[in-house]
């Protein structure tokens, strides 16, 4: 009888030890944050997923054309709550506020757990890391243009973060803009040039143009809102506008050429060369186009832009149309370039 008890105790001890060893193992299916982003394949897959949130001509909406809604160029049937002073962070649904910070969390997860060994940090891996910095700048800029002064998300907040710990004060809009420009500078130092992927991935030149756009936006905002309730706490308009000029000079020294009739052998005049920037199916050889998306039925990358244009649909909120001032501008241009 004692032998049976001893055998039972020994067996129980073995099982407990085995269970303990098994529980110490990393799950085979669920990736570990500590070991996930440690090689080029994992880094590539993760960064590829960040592209999905960028504006494009999907099943609904006009992609980047829809960004013109409620500008001087397009008038929407549904008025812009931001322009009317009604935009709030807490309105139901996936708001602009939620969209921006949800995407920032995804980017910051990558930057927090990126742990590729230095010996394996090839130019390809470093360029992917540069893309992540571009995405973080992009989503901060998205929020800046809609809300002005915002909390900057410069680190990843995991599931253990407390509510109190997430009460991050907003930074002045000028400081937010500079943070964005610093991220784009970091991206520029790591990214490949356009020639590597023919503009199908974020590149060094695209980061520079994005930085110019951010600096121009903030520089002109501070210039024309000086002395108003919307002014930045620290006036840095001249500094931002100077950055636009500096980046522009550097960009053209990198050999970027404009699409003119001399560079585009498929056209006979400058009007057609300009038109090819917007009506070509393949822009890989058009150096002026720094970042674009190639649609392909074979790859199931499709859109409904033609249908939306014919129906006037701009996005899920409804239709939008060209403003009279935009049409007048084009008519004036045609009269100038073709007097006959």
Q: How should each PLM-predicted stretch be described?
A:
Residues 6-12:
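Sec-dependent N-terminal signal peptides
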Residues 41-56, 77-147, 163-199:
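Conserved, well-structured interaction surfaces
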Residues 12-13, 223:
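Alpha-helical transmembrane segments and their juxtamembrane interfaces
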Residues 20-79, 150, 154, 185-186, ...:
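An aromatic- and glycine-enriched ligand-binding surface/loop that stacks and positions planar moieties
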């Amino acid at each position: 009888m004692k032998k049976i008890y001893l055998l039972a105790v020994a067996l129980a001890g073995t099982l407990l030890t085995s269970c303990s060893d098994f529980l110490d193992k990393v799950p085979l299916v669920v990736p570990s944050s500590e070991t996930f982003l440690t090689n080029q394949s994992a880094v590539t897959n993760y960064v590829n997923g960040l592209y999905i949130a960028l504006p494009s001509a999907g099943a609904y909406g006009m992609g980047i054309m829809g960004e013109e809604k409620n500008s001087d160029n397009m008038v929407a049937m549904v008025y812009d709550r931001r322009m009317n002073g009604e935009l709030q962070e807490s309105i139901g649904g996936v708001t602009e506020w939620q969209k921006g910070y949800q995407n920032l969390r995804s980017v910051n997860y990558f930057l927090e757990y990126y742990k590729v060994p230095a010996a394996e940090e090839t130019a390809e891996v470093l360029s992917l890391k540069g893309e992540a910095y571009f995405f973080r700048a992009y989503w901060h800029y998205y929020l800046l243009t809609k809300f002005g002064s915002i909390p900057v998300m410069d680190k990843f907040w995991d599931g253990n973060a407390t509510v109190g710990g997430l009460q991050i004060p907003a930074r002045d809009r000028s400081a937010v803009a500079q943070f964005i420009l610093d991220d784009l500078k970091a991206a520029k130092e790591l990214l490949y040039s356009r020639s590597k992927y023919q503009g199908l991935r974020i590149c060094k030149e695209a980061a520079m143009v994005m930085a110019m756009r951010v600096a121009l936006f903030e520089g002109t905002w501070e210039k024309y809102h000086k002395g108003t309730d919307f002014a930045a706490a620290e006036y840095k308009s001249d500094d931002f506008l100077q950055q636009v000029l500096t980046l522009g000079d550097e960009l053209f020294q990198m050999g970027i050429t404009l699409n003119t009739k001399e560079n585009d052998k498929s056209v006979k005049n400058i009007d057609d060369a300009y038109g090819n920037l917007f009506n070509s199916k393949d822009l890989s050889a058009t150096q002026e186009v720094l970042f674009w998306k190639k649609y392909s039925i074979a790859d199931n990358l499709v859109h409904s832009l033609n249908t939306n244009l014919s129906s006037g649909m701009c996005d899920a909120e409804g239709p939008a149309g060209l403003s009279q001032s935009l049409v007048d501008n084009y008519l004036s241009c045609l009269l100038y370039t073709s007097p006959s």
